[in-house]
């Protein structure tokens, strides 16, 4: 007899707790913003998920790759003699704009 009363109280307690938990979760999910549309924030979130090496437009190129990039960008060899573009782009990262301003400023 005592066992059945304890079992009935336990079942009632479990049903009440489950009902409260379900209501709490429903209220919590209702407070979340599902239709949040901000393209700038979304871009930054996607941007931060990308690998660090792919985030910027600067690239690290060394050796003959620099010569090929200069040939493509300038249509010939680097006209600037005071800067070593190959060493600079290998040690530090360069953008395409850096290559064009340093090697062929007339372009």
Curated annotation (Swiss-Prot):
Gene from which this protein is expressed: ins-3
Entry-linked Pfam families: Ins_beta
Prodomain residues: 20-55
Family membership: Belongs to the insulin family.
Gene3D superfamilies cross-referenced by the UniProt entry: Insulin-like
InterPro entries per the UniProt record, alphabetical: Insulin-like_regulatory (IPR052335), Insulin-like_sf (IPR036438), Insulin_CS (IPR022353), Nem_insulin-like_b-type (IPR003235)
Originating species: Caenorhabditis elegans
Cysteine pairs bridged by disulfides in the record: 62-90, 74-103, 78-104, 89-94
Record's GO cellular component terms: extracellular region
Protein's GO biological process: dauer larval development; negative regulation of dauer entry
Chief place of localization: secreted
Residues making up the signal peptide according to the UniProt record: 1-19
GO MF term (any one): hormone activity
Protein name in the entry: Probable insulin-like peptide beta-type 3
Source superkingdom: Eukaryota
Keyword terms of this UniProt record: Cleavage on pair of basic residues, Disulfide bond, Secreted, Signal
Entry's localization field: Secreted
Source organism phylogeny: Eukaryota, Metazoa, Ecdysozoa, Nematoda, Chromadorea
